[in-house]
């Protein structure tokens, strides 16, 4: 006699907790992003405030990746694949214009062979060097479509919404890049 395989139990509380935490990360990131990019002005407190904002934004950017990772595994909102995909798309899009579907397709290969030449998230030729890994990661996941989306967002921020270039680099680009390390 074979034992029946039980279906995973969908836990509404887990979904609520996951979505609440994801919402807090996205909202916190958005508030700091809007302040830093559009309202922060150089002044007497810049040296004290700007590094703190960059540090928190960097952590929030890591949070975007963590939320997307949970969404890829379906653990953000168990039993709700479309909701997981929607939240994953939002967080990766805000993070750096990455396509959730592209990363989700390659992600199982990472778990199948972590830290090996077959791991798309690992740079086997020079495993301890950050720059070659970083460039390899971007070549793997950041294509022309992502570049077009990111370029459009930057142009809208600069010319449509009046963001200062230094603020965009400091409070959006720098935290996103730092969070990848």
Predicted regions and their residues:
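Membrane-interface helix-boundary motifs at transmembrane edges
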Residues: 42-45, 74-83
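Membrane-embedded alpha-helical segments that form the functional core of polytopic membrane enzymes
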Residues: 43-64, 90-98
């Amino acid at each position: 006699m074979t034992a029946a395989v039980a279906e995973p139990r969908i836990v509404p509380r887990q979904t609520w907790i996951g979505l609440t935490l994801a919402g807090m990360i996205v909202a916190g990131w958005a508030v700091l992003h809007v302040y830093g990019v559009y309202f922060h002005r150089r002044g007497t407190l810049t040296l004290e405030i700007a590094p703190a904002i960059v540090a928190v934004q960097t952590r929030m950017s890591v949070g975007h990746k963590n939320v997307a990772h949970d969404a890829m595994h379906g653990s953000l909102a168990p039993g709700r694949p479309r909701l997981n995909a929607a939240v994953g798309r939002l967080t990766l899009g805000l993070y750096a214009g990455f396509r959730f579907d592209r990363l989700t397709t390659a992600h199982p290969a990472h778990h199948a062979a972590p830290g090996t030449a077959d791991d798309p998230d690992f740079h086997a030729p020079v495993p301890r060097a950050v720059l070659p890994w970083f460039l390899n990661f971007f070549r793997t996941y950041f294509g022309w479509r992502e570049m077009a989306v990111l370029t459009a967002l930057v142009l809208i921020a600069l010319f449509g919404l009046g963001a200062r270039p230094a603020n965009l680099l400091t409070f959006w680009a720098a935290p996103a890049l730092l969070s990848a390390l």
